[in-house]
Regions:
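Short hydrophobic core segments
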Residues: 6-8, 106, 124-135, 169-170, ...
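Flexible, glycine-rich terminal cap/loop adjacent to redox cofactors
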Residues: 8-34, 39, 46, 50-57, ...
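Glycine-rich dinucleotide-binding loop and its adjacent helix/turn
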Residues: 45, 133-189, 193, 272-289
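A Rossmann-like FAD-binding core segment of flavoenzymes
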Residues: 100-103, 107-118, 186-285, 289, ...
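FAD-site-proximal beta/loop scaffold in flavoenzymes
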Residues: 147-162, 251-320
Length: 449
């Protein structure tokens, strides 16, 4: 069978590509070996945010025990009464849009050719454009004996129906801190081991500091600057497994959550049939590996976000169909949904100056603002970075209760290159986090003269 687009992977990037391609009149085949919809709605973004909300209510004294949180989570991921989420809605949506869906392992079989294998049956497909949207997988850290302990991936952590007696989180990125807060707020003793000097190292340093305060407030034992080197299985379900650290100390947990990063599953895709190697497949900056072959989503970089995957899936379709567009990541937002939320976009002051910009930053201490007073905030910040040369915003970060929403004014300002003077002259509702931004824009405008 021949299609305009053959898409391997039905996560956010693959689904977005399929829907847009069908809306443009293209024929589409979508392949996935596991759940249509990908990790986000079933094991990642959706269940974790449901659990974070439940944990927040529980911590505030609401009637929200773990069983209720678990039941709500199962409802959200279509797993009520099941051992595995039901992706029927995702499959139906694609088919209703006119796409053909294939469950099985898809691999390249030469330029423009894909073979789908399912239960020993192979289906050959041809595509004018082939898109690889295979997502990412949990990275197994190089720790001696790790195979012998009770490890969790993010799937296990977001799907658990029983609370562990204790939890050890290896890795202090967004996944690690979000799930640490969930379990800590339900009364589980939690330890985070982070090899670097700060949590969420890809985010703004002030956000990292806020994340540390949030973890400590909720009773999480955070170990920074130490690396796990050896695992000692307990051999008894009632006792925790022990992880030896490179400073001579130990950390323990009845469950050990692996949150040290992600790997890209490019092996087994048949890349060698088109002259490529799985070990290194850089795209051309326009998501193309070669004519007619695109790489989108987590496997394309530069970061790992569902919203980036959605953007790239649609963008690749537009480029394949001849639109004059190219990727633009200047205004790529990042959000971590802890309490408080953490969000950022663009560059830090240090990054701006390293890039040769004549930049400065303006910072508000969130607890001293009207919004901060109203929510009794103990810590947090709102920061903007401005380029004197262009008089534009080039970066922003915040740790506030609604940061994931409030950051988008800055996302739009960076994307559209809105002058700081215009941002300062725009009326913002009081008291809100956006109003704090308004004050920072005004201060920046005065500094610019």
């Amino acid at each position: 069978m021949r299609y305009d687009f053959v898409i391997i992977g039905a996560g956010p990037a693959g689904e977005a590509a399929a829907y847009l391609a069908r809306s443009r009149g293209a024929s589409v085949a979508v392949i996935d070996r596991d759940l249509f919809g990908g990790s986000c709605p079933h094991w990642g973004c959706v269940p974790s945010k449901s659990l974070l909300n439940a944990a927040s209510l529980h911590a505030a004294g609401g009637d929200y025990p773990w069983q209720r949180a678990s039941d709500r989570r199962d409802y959200m991921i279509n797993r009520v009464g099941l051992d595995y989420p039901d992706d029927t809605g995702h499959v139906r949506g694609l088919r209703d849009a006119g796409a053909d869906t294939f469950r099985g392992v898809g691999r390249l079989d030469g330029p423009g050719r894909v073979v789908v294998r399912h239960e020993a049956v192979e289906h050959p497909l041809e595509g004018r454009h082939v898109m690889l949207a295979v997502g990412s997988e949990t990275k197994m850290p190089p720790i001696e004996g790790i195979d012998g302990v009770r490890t969790w991936t993010n799937r296990d952590a977001t799907a658990a129906r029983e609370l562990p007696a204790s939890l050890l989180v290896l890795g202090g990125g967004p996944t690690g801190v979000e799930l640490a807060q969930v379990y800590a707020r339900f009364g589980v003793p939690v330890t985070i081991v982070q090899s670097g000097p700060r949590l969420i190292p890809t985010d703004h340093p002030r956000n990292s500091a806020a994340a540390l305060l949030a973890m400590q407030r909720d009773g999480v034992d955070v170990r920074l600057g130490v690396r796990a080197v050896r695992a000692r299985p307990a051999g008894d379900p009632a006792r925790p497994d022990v992880i030896e650290l490179d400073d001579g100390s130990t950390a323990a947990g009845h469950a050990v959550l692996l949150a040290v990063g992600r790997t890209i599953p490019l092996g087994g895709l048949g890349l060698e049939t088109v002259g490529l190697q799985a070990g290194g497949v850089p795209h051309d900056g326009r998501l193309r590996l070669q004519d007619g072959l695109y790489l989108v989503g987590d496997c394309a970089g530069p970061e790992l976000h569902t919203h980036q995957a959605h953007y790239q899936g649609e963008l690749a379709v537009r480029m394949a169909l001849g639109d004059d567009v190219a990727p633009d990541y200047r205004a790529l937002p990042r959000a971590t949904y802890t309490d408080p939320e953490l969000a950022s976009v663009g560059v830090t002051l240090e990054e701006a100056m390293a890039a040769g910009l004549d930049a400065f930053e303006v910072v508000a201490d969130f607890p001293t603002t009207a919004k901060g007073y109203s929510v009794e905030a103990a810590f947090g910040h709102v920061t903007i970075v401005v380029d004197r040369g262009s008089r534009h915003l080039v970066g922003a970060a915040m740790a506030t209760p609604d940061a994931s929403a409030a950051i988008h004014e800055c996302v739009l300002a960076i994307k559209a290159r809105v002058p700081v003077a215009v941002l300062a002259d725009t009326i913002h509702a009081f008291p809100s986090t956006s109003r704090i931004l308004n004050g920072l824009f005004a201060e920046a405008a005065r500094s610019l003269g």
